[in-house]
Amino acid sequence: MAVPKKKTSKSRKNMRRAHDFLTAPAASVCPQCKSPKLPHRACASCGTYKGREVVKTEEI
């Protein structure tokens, strides 16, 4: 079993973990209904994508 020969310093440990953070998803605004939506996807509230209705949504 492999065992480290020297203690890993706090600096080296933190540099190794520097890229492990989570990034927030990018959000854009739907031009039709002005609700937030993910880019390159149809709007969840109105069902439009690039000015066309691609998903039928029922009004409640």
From Swiss-Prot:
Entry keywords, A to Z: Ribonucleoprotein, Ribosomal protein
Cell wall biogenesis/degradation as UniProt keyword: no
A GO biological-process term: translation
SUPFAM superfamilies: Zn-binding ribosomal proteins (SSF57829)
UniProt xrefs under InterPro entries: Ribosomal_bL32, Ribosomal_bL32_bact, Ribosomal_zn-bd
Molecular function via GO: structural constituent of ribosome
Keyword Ribonucleoprotein among record annotations: yes
GO cellular component, one term: large ribosomal subunit
Disulfide-linked positions: none
Domain of life: Bacteria
Family classification: Belongs to the bacterial ribosomal protein bL32 family.
PANTHER family the record matches: 50S RIBOSOMAL PROTEIN L32 (PTHR35534), LARGE RIBOSOMAL SUBUNIT PROTEIN BL32 (PTHR35534:SF1)
NCBIfam families membership: rpmF_bact (TIGR01031)
Record's protein name: Large ribosomal subunit protein bL32
The organism's taxonomic lineage, starting at the top: Bacteria, Pseudomonadati, Thermodesulfobacteriota, Desulfuromonadia, Geobacterales
